[in-house]
């Protein structure tokens, strides 16, 4: 679902079965299409990461999901993204898929300190960490909740450092 969604958003993707690699041509935080509908199915990782990515964009997108994903938690991530300036229109239940996302635009003025409850999922934090580079070092995340997700968060931060991002103050 993740790669298909990125293709729907207009990204150029090259897959080499032989080399077992996927190459996605980035655009410095920008999304090629300003409007699109994507499907995340039951993929929680794709759902959380893509929602954060779209929320930091300058477009409007609709995210569809499976019935199972509609029941999974998203509220704490969505509240944090609203704190950064994104807006959401819920097409069924509040704080659940399907939804329309209107991004905050690449606007570092809106980047500041946000609060994030990670009791229900560490993916919320990983999603915010991955979009943090758009804030040019101005994003500070204060964690609430007691979920022990250190290994996943460290994996996210290590991956980001491989791409040259110094990290986020938490």
Provide a role label for each language-model segment.
Residues 1-170:
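Structural preference for solvent-exposed beta-strand-turn elements
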């Amino acid at each position: 679902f993740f790669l298909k969604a990125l293709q729907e958003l207009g990204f150029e993707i090259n897959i080499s079965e032989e080399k077992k690699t996927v190459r996605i041509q980035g655009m410095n935080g920008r999304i090629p299409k300003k409007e699109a509908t994507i499907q995340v199915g039951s993929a929680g990782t794709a759902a959380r990461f893509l929602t954060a990515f779209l929320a930091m964009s300058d477009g409007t997108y609709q995210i569809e999901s499976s019935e199972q994903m509609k029941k999974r938690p998203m509220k704490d991530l969505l509240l944090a993204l609203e704190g950064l300036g994104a807006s959401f229109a819920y097409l069924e239940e509040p704080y659940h898929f399907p939804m329309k996302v209107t991004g905050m635009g690449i606007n570092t003025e809106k980047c500041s300190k946000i609060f994030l409850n990670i009791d229900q999922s560490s993916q919320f934090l990983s999603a915010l960490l991955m979009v943090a580079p758009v804030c040019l070092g101005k994003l500070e995340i204060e964690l609430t909740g007691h979920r022990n997700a250190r290994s996943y968060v460290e994996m996210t931060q290590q991956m980001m450092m491989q791409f040259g991002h110094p990290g986020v103050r938490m």
